[in-house]
Amino acid sequence: MPYSEVEAKFLGPGKEQTREPCYKKLKSAADDGVSPLRGGPDIHRIQEKPRNNRVAVATINFRRRVCPQEDKTSTDVLKPLHKEMPGDKLGGSESIGSPALQDGKPSPLAKDDEIYSTSKAFIGPIYKPPEKKKCRERKSETDTFSSIDSKRRQEEKQKSNSKKLEMDTELSQFYKEIEELENENEASQGSCTEPEPSEEPIISYDWACNTLKSEEENKDLSDVLQSHCGYQEYLEDEPDYPCDEQLMPAFCETSFPSFRPEWQSMHPFVIPHDPLSSFNYFNFQRFGTPLHPSPDVFHGRDDSQMQNGCYVDSYQDGWSCLTFDQNDEYANYDVTSNNVHPFRNGCSVQDESVNNGFCEIRECWQDPSMDKHNETDRFVNQWFQEEKLNKLQKLLILLRGLPGSGKTTLSRILLGQSRDGIVFSTDDYFHHQDGYRYNVNQLGDAHDWNQNRAKQAIDQGRSPVIIDNTNTQAWEMKPYVEMAIGKGYRVEFHEPETWWKFDPEELEKRNKHGVSRKKIAQMLDRYEFQMSISIVMNSVEPTQKSIQRPLPLEGEQRWGGSLGSHSQVSIADDY
C-alpha cells in the first residue's frame, strides 16, 4: 500500500484541521490535470500515473499569502519525510507534471508546501545486521572452548605421561628388588661364583689327594672336611662327577638334586635343669633352611612328616653319626665338667654339664679355611655329611599311641616296606598257646625280655627294628634309644594318624583287651605329645611309680606296671 497522502484542510478560524488520505479524492489514472482542493480555489493538485502503477501526488500552493496556518501544518506533517529522504536526491520528494520541476529547478513554493511524495528507496533505521555480531560471538566462544579443550588435553596427556613414568619406575624398582632377593637366595643356598683368588697358591689335585691319604691314615675327620679333595674322592663313583687332574670346578655349575633324606641338626644331651644348647653340627646348613636351628627343632607333630597315613618324626641327625666301638660301652662318658677332650674323630668338645653319662656339649671345628672359602667349605661339609648319613640305612622306629589307636596296623604297613624288618612288643610276652593271659607281677620281666630281643636284632644289623608299645612318656623309650644310638641307628617316632586316637570313647570300643574309658583317659592325661631324641635321653624314670601310677583293677593291670606297662597295648584292627 502506498504511503498515505495527507491533506491539510483549513476550515476557518477557530476550526480544527482534519487529515484525510488523498487517494480517496484522486481521479482515474487516465485524467491528467489539476483538481481543486477543499481548502480553496487557488490550490490545485497535479496527478500523474507513472509507469510503475504508483500515483505520485504533489500539492502546490500558488498563493503563499493564503492559509499560513495550512503551510505550517503541511510542513509539520512532512518533517519526518524530509529528514529521511532529502529533496535533492532521486529517491526524495519529486513533483511530477509541474513545469517548475520539469526544468530541474526546485520551486521555492514546493519546499515548504510539499505535502507528500513517494520513493523507491527503503525508509527505515540504519543499523548493522545482527548476524555478523552473532557469528563473531560464536567464533570467539568456539575459540575459547577450543583453547580450554586443548589445555585440558595437554594436562591429561601430561598426567598420563607422569603416571606412565611412575608405573615404569615402580616396575623397574620391583624388578630390582626381585633380582636382589634372588641374589640373596642364591647367596644363601650356595656360592654361584668362583671364590676370589687369594694370595696363597692354588691347591693342586695331586697335593690334595696326597693330603687326603695322610688324613685318612690318621682318621682325622675335621681335616678331611677342610680338604677339597674329599669332595673329588667321594664323587669318583658318581657318573656326573669325573675326577681328573684339574682344579676343582666351580660349584655353581653343578646341581645336586639327588641328595637323599633330609639331614636335620639336633640338640645334644642336656640334664633336665639346664636349658638346651644351640647345637650347630658341622656348621653348615641345607639349602633353604636356617643356619642355626631353633631350640624347638624337635617337636612331636610339628616336625613330623606324613608317611603311609601317619605322622613320622624323622630324626636323621647327629646321633646317627656316632660311631662307638662295640666293645666300648660309653667308656668316654666318665668325665668332669669344663674338660675339653677330643671326641667324634677329632672334634673339640667342651663338656658343660654331665648327668648319667650324657653331657651338654658344644662342638667347634678348627677350620682356618672357613674364613676364606666359607661357602665352598660349607657345601663340601654338607655333602660329606649327607653321604655319611646315606650309608647309615639302619633304622629304629618307636611307635606311640593309646590302646586302640591303630599302632599294630601301622607296624604291619611299615614292616611290609622292608624285607629285613622286625616288630617287637612287650605285649607278646603274655601271649600263650591257649590265649592271652596278663599278669602284673610279670610286667618287669616282660619289659626286659622285649628289650633283649630288640638289642639282639640291632646287634645283628636288622632294619628297621619296630617297637610296638604305647610309649606315652619319654623315659619308657630311653633303653631302646640308647642301644640304637650306640650302634649308629637312626631313630624315628611314629604315631598313627587316626581321627579317634585321642578320643577315649572311641578307643574303648576299638581296643581288643578291654581297656576302660577311664583308664584310657588317665593315660591320655600323662601323654607327652612333643617327643625327640634329646627329650628321651634327658628323661628320668620316676622313683615313686606306685604313687604316680596306681595299680589298675582286675583286667586293667597290664597298664599299671613299674616300667611303664601302659606301653604294652598295641592292638588295633584298622584305622
Swiss-Prot record:
Keywords: Coiled coil. GO terms for biological process: blastocyst development; in utero embryonic development; negative regulation of hematopoietic stem cell differentiation; negative regulation of transcription by RNA polymerase II; positive regulation of hematopoietic stem cell proliferation. Gene3D superfamilies: P-loop containing nucleotide triphosphate hydrolases (3.40.50.300). Residues 162-194 form a coiled coil. The keyword Repeat does not apply. Residues 69-169, 555-575 are annotated as: Disordered. InterPro entries: NEDD4-bd_p2, P-loop_NTPase. This is NEDD4-binding protein 2-like 2. The lineage of its organism: Eukaryota, Metazoa, Chordata, Craniata, Vertebrata. The gene is N4bp2l2.
